[in-house]
């Protein structure tokens, strides 16, 4: 049975965060692309002059957990609502997006929380 776009979207709606993260990672590895590049290209195509517009959505990227792996895992669990195993896998897979599509103020607040427990974080 061939899957169509609607089948995939229906599955994504019911999928857990880690299932989606695993899917994105598998797509990145299989096709040699990154989600960040694909999003940037799509935005540039849909907007005539992307350079002149100010960015309104930001992603919080965990670059590394530093010396406080356990505290970072706890904070990631609190932020994302993931289970212990899922949060641990996400932290250990750094650099990885913790949250995407946030306002600038929310992204900066999240960055401060993660840095307070020893993580190295970027907002893109």
From Swiss-Prot:
Disulfide bonds: none annotated. SUPFAM superfamilies: ClpS-like, Ribosomal protein L7/12, oligomerisation (N-terminal) domain. The keyword Ribonucleoprotein applies. GO terms for molecular function: mRNA binding; structural constituent of ribosome. The keyword Ribosomal protein applies. It holds the Pfam family Ribosomal_L12. GO terms for cellular component: cytosol; cytosolic large ribosomal subunit. Keywords: Ribonucleoprotein, Ribosomal protein. GO terms for biological process: translation. InterPro entries: Ribosomal_bL12 (IPR000206), Ribosomal_bL12_C (IPR013823), Ribosomal_bL12_C/ClpS-like (IPR014719), Ribosomal_bL12_oligo (IPR008932), Ribosomal_bL12_oligo_N_sf (IPR036235). Homodimer. Part of the ribosomal stalk of the 50S ribosomal subunit. Forms a multimeric L10(L12)X complex, where L10 forms an elongated spine to which 2 to 4 L12 dimers bind in a sequential fashion. Binds GTP-bound translation factors. Forms part of the ribosomal stalk which helps the ribosome interact with GTP-bound translation factors. Is thus essential for accurate translation. Belongs to the bacterial ribosomal protein bL12 family. This is Large ribosomal subunit protein bL12. It comes from Borreliella burgdorferi (strain ATCC 35210 / DSM 4680 / CIP 102532 / B31) (Borrelia burgdorferi).
């Amino acid at each position: 049975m061939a899957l169509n776009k609607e089948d995939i979207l229906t599955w994504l709606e019911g999928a857990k965060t880690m299932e989606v993260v695993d899917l994105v990672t598998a797509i990145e590895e299989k096709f040699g692309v990154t989600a960040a590049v694909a999003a940037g290209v799509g935005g540039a195509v849909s907007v005539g002059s992307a350079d002149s517009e100010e960015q309104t959505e930001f992603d919080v990227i965990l670059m590394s957990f530093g010396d406080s792996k356990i505290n970072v895992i706890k904070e990631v669990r609190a932020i994302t609502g993931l289970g212990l195993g899922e949060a641990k896998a996400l932290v250990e897979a750094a650099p990885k997006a913790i949250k995407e599509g946030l306002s600038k103020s929310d992204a900066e607040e999240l960055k401060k929380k993660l840095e307070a427990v020893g993580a190295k974080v970027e907002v893109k």
